């Protein structure tokens, strides 16, 4: 189930020398949105261990509104896979378009940074779709 994880406006300080948003800025927002999705289901630490290919379909400009939706699609022994979609709303036309998608993988870790089983850090009362992923 896709959920809104992050939404905001682009400001001049977010732009590269070409006048559009710096790609690394978008990736960092995607990582933050993914971490929010992860924190919704676990009570511990998790770290990003993999990001799939990211292809940008169009630039994002100053004043545009970005929307990042996430969906947890797979739960492993210690890993969580999240699909991430970035949409942009043009601040002039208010037209919404998809900018990029990617898949992020997080691993739950202990205080030393070693992976630990998800079962040991899952929050109570998980959404039904997460419960279904646990039984796969």
Predicted regions and their residues:
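Short, well-ordered turn and helix-capping elements at secondary-structure junctions
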Residues: 10-14, 51-58, 88-90
């Amino acid at each position: 189930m896709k959920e809104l994880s992050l939404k905001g406006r682009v400001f001049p300080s977010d732009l590269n020398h070409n006048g559009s948003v710096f790609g690394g800025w978008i990736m960092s927002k995607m990582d933050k949105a993914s971490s929010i999705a992860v924190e919704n289901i676990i009570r511990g630490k998790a770290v990003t261990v993999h990001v799939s290919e990211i292809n940008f379909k169009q630039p994002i400009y100053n004043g545009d509104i970005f929307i990042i939706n996430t969906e947890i699609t797979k739960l492993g022994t210690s890993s969580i896979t999240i699909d991430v979609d970035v949409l942009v709303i043009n601040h002039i036309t208010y037209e919404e378009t998809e900018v990029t998608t990617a898949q992020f993988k997080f691993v739950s870790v202990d205080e030393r940074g070693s992976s630990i089983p998800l079962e040991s850090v899952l929050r109570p009362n998980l959404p039904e779709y997460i419960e279904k992923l646990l039984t796969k």
